[in-house]
Amino acid sequence: QDAVIHLAAETGTGQSMYQIEKYVDTNIGGTALLLDILTNTKHHVKRVLVAESRAIYGEGKYHCPHCGDVYPMGRNDADMAKGDFECKCPKCGGAVELVATTEDSAIHPSSVYGIAKQVQGQLVHLVCPTIGVESVSFRYQNVYGPGQSLSNPYTGILSIFSTRIKNGHGINIFEDGKETRDFVYIDDVVDATILGLEVLKANGCIFNIGTGMATDVLTVANTLCEKYGIQVPVTISGNYRLGDIRHNYADISLARRILGFEPKFSFTDGIAQFCKWVDKQEA
């Protein structure tokens, strides 16, 4: 084989906080094993593409009118208990505006999973050049689409919400429902990954792979109900989990420029395809 696409990993951000050894051994240890094999055996591998994650950015990039671009480390319990869920400027404590997170943004993983994904990328970019193998890493946003598990809660809110809706159960949304993510459809991810293998200039690069658009969680819930034609109670609970990020969406201009990547599926189009697939499954 000429290339390795290294996607294998445990993926539960929350779960990683109480199964630390499992996530470190599987994600970092698995990458180390792959690199050991590439270093110490004969093979024909010319390029390794490793999956990093948006999780390495933590809260991501914001702009403060007084302090410029800033990278909040996280939110505090006191603010969230009062229903104030937005990030604050880490320098002046003032309000900040969300902006797209670029690849050169500060790295602030807020979970063991995020740290493990960061290390996976660092290992690949460190070792591969020393053995004559090219390296590329992709920081995927929230990937979804046909084929994802509907029974594993760690595959994301689309699976969780879909299963509840199809079974006639209500949806409980944390915080105020305005928290956002960048949802990218699997077909676009496949296209990007192929480009990551084929484009020569991608060697040694790190790319954000998403849509560059933020969608809030309440919109996700309402859109799923609409697509399935099933109305269930959608409750904004105000509950929260420390360590969850508020917002994050990708700046994909580098992937556009170097890879020629352009996402084809809007959130609405991708969700429609996803729901058609779910309708054929057993919820």
Where are these regions (language model features)?
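N-terminal Rossmann-like NAD(P)+-binding domain of SDR-like oxidoreductases, especially those catalyzing
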Residues: Q1-Q141
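Short aromatic-enriched loop/helix-cap "lid" or pocket-rim segments at secondary-structure transitions
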Residues: E59-C64, Q148-N152, V220-A221, T235, ...
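Gly/Ser/Thr-rich beta-alpha loop segments that engage phosphate groups in nucleotides
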Residues: G14, A32, G60, A116, ...
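Short beta-strand segments
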Residues: L49-E52, S137-G145, E175, I206-T211
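Hydrophobic alpha-helix immediately C-terminal to the catalytic Tyr-X-X-X-Lys motif of short-chain
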Residues: V119, L123-V127, I157, F161, ...
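C-terminal substrate-binding subdomain of Rossmann-fold SDR/epimerase-dehydratase oxidoreductases
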Residues: I165-A283
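The catalytic Tyr-centered alpha-helix of NAD(P)H-dependent dehydrogenases
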Residues: P109-A116, Y140, L150, Y154-L158, ...
